[in-house]
Design a protein with these regions (language model features):
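Signature of N-terminal electron-transfer/Fe-S-associated modules in redox systems
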Residues: 1-150
C-alpha cells in the first residue's frame, strides 16, 4: 500500500488516492471504492468495451477511451477520468445519451455506457466522423448503435 497522497480527477472532481494498492484495476477502484457503477465489467479482457472510460492526461485533445478493466490505478495518477456518470444526468443528458435513448439503441443497457463513452471520445477527438471512424471507435458493436452514432 502507499502512504503518499496521489490525486486523480473523476468526472472533474479531485479524489485523493491513499492506502490503496496501485495495482488494483481502475474499474474495481471506481466501482468498489467510489460506487461509480455505470462502468461495467463484461469480459475482463478489454474486448467488449463495457468498462470504457475516457482518460485525459494533459488536455482535452489528449483524451481517449481506455478499458478500465485492463488499466491499473497507479497508471492513471494525475489523470482526469470521465465515466458515463460524468457525461450527463437525467435532467441534462449528453446529446449522445439522448440519441441512444431516442433511437432505442441500448438493447439491455449493460454495454451502453461503453458505446456512449467511445462515441463521445470520437466526437471530442476532432476526427472526421464517418463509417470508418465510427467502426474504429465501436468495433464489434451492433447495427442500432452504429446507426445512432452516424
Amino acid at each position: 500500500m502507499t502512504d503518499s497522497k496521489n490525486i486523480i480527477y473523476i468526472n472533474n472532481k479531485k479524489v485523493e488516492v491513499t492506502n490503496v494498492y496501485h495495482d488494483i484495476t481502475l474499474l474495481d477502484w471506481l466501482r468498489n471504492y467510489h460506487k461509480i457503477t455505470g462502468t461495467k465489467e463484461g469480459c475482463a479482457e478489454g474486448d467488449c468495451g463495457a468498462c470504457s472510460v475516457i482518460i485525459n492526461k494533459k488536455s482535452k485533445e489528449d483524451s481517449k477511451p481506455i478499458n478500465s478493466c485492463l488499466v491499473r490505478l497507479g497508471q492513471v495518477i494525475g489523470s482526469n477520468i470521465t465515466t458515463i456518470e460524468g457525461l450527463g444526468c437525467d435532467k441534462n443528458p449528453h446529446p449522445l445519451q439522448m440519441a441512444f435513448s431516442n433511437e432505442y439503441a441500448s438493447q439491455c443497457g449493460y454495454c451502453t455506457p461503453g458505446f456512449i463513452i467511445s462515441g463521445v471520445s470520437l466526437i471530442n477527438s476532432g476526427k472526421v466522423i464517418n463509417n470508418d471512424t465510427i467502426n474504429d471507435a465501436i468495433s464489434g458493436n451492433y447495427v442500432d448503435a452504429l446507426v445512432t452514432l452516424q
